[in-house]
């Protein structure tokens, strides 16, 4: 007697596996697609917090706030990533800091509490519209 020794997967089984992999990819890829953007944003927020600490240290030493990032280097303030542009703008009774991140970003506003800005007022443009990051 002769037996048929065919081994392997049928076309239907292979198609089912491909569909399952496609469904998993459709769920997983959007979940992790903006991971780099979120990490960059978290690093930028940490830079802003460190900048606020450095500004308060500078104020305690010289009775005024620093007007450039370079004035804070003696306090060992360094931006965590060279891909951002961090600037300080002197304001009446305080200062404003801006971080510009290259590339497309979804809208978000970070407001920190600082002296001279009670309640954490958001930064605004010339039209009074909150600046988005």
Residue ranges, per PLM feature:
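Periplasmic/extracellular, small/polar-rich flexible segments of pilin-like filament-forming proteins
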Residues: 53-133
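N-terminal single-pass transmembrane signal-anchor helix
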Residues: 2-32
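Aliphatic-rich helix starts adjacent to a transmembrane/signal segment
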Residues: 31-48
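Short amphipathic alpha-helical/adjacent loop interface patches that line ligand
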Residues: 5, 48, 52
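Regular, well-ordered alpha-helical segments
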Residues: 26, 34-37, 53, 57-60
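Hydrophobic transmembrane-helix microenvironments that flank and shape a buried ionizable site
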Residues: 10, 44, 52-53
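Compositionally biased non-globular segments, especially hydrophobic aliphatic-rich helices
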Residues: 13, 42-45, 126-127
């Amino acid at each position: 007697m002769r037996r048929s020794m065919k081994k392997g997967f049928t076309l239907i089984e292979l198609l089912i596996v491909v569909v399952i992999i496609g469904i998993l990819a459709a769920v997983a890829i959007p979940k992790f697609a903006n991971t780099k953007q979120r990490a960059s944003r978290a690093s930028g927020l940490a830079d802003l917090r460190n900048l606020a600490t450095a500004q308060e240290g500078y104020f305690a030493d010289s009775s005024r706030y620093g007007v450039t990032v370079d004035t804070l280097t003696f306090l060992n303030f360094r931006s965590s990533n060279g891909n951002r542009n961090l600037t300080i703008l002197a304001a009446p009774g305080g200062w404003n800091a801006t971080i510009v991140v290259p590339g497309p970003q979804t809208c978000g506003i970070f407001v920190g509490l600082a002296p001279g800005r009670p309640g954490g007022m958001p930064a605004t443009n010339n039209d009074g519209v909150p600046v988005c990051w």
